[in-house]
């Protein structure tokens, strides 16, 4: 949770439609919904595992009800896993529409 709170990517563009996020961030316009943090080494020199961080409030605010929240979480997680594996989201879940 500390990572999610401390590291929410923020962009305040003049034109929200022109925001370009890196591939490890799933976003809705200028609002980040999730971020893939790759494996690496922490400050003590210990190896770390890759993590998917979901930004709860931005995701919750985009869902009208529980069913929509479930669908959005599924879509975001599929996108993040696909990014981690270096494949298209349709490889992870062929039922997703490619937008």
Predicted regions and their residues:
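Predominantly extracellular/secreted Zn2+-dependent metalloproteases
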Residues: 1-31
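Active-site scaffold of zinc-dependent metalloenzymes
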Residues: 26-74, 84-99
């Amino acid at each position: 949770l500390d990572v999610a709170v401390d590291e929410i990517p923020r962009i305040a563009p003049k034109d929200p439609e022109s925001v370009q996020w890196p591939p490890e961030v799933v976003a809705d316009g200028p609002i980040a919904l999730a971020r893939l943090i790759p494996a690496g080494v922490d400050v003590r020199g210990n190896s770390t595992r890759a993590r998917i961080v979901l930004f709860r409030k931005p995701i919750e605010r985009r869902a009208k009800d529980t069913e929509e929240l479930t669908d959005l979480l599924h879509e975001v997680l599929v996108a993040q896993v696909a990014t981690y594996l270096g494949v298209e989201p349709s490889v992870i879940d062929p039922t997703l529409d490619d937008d």
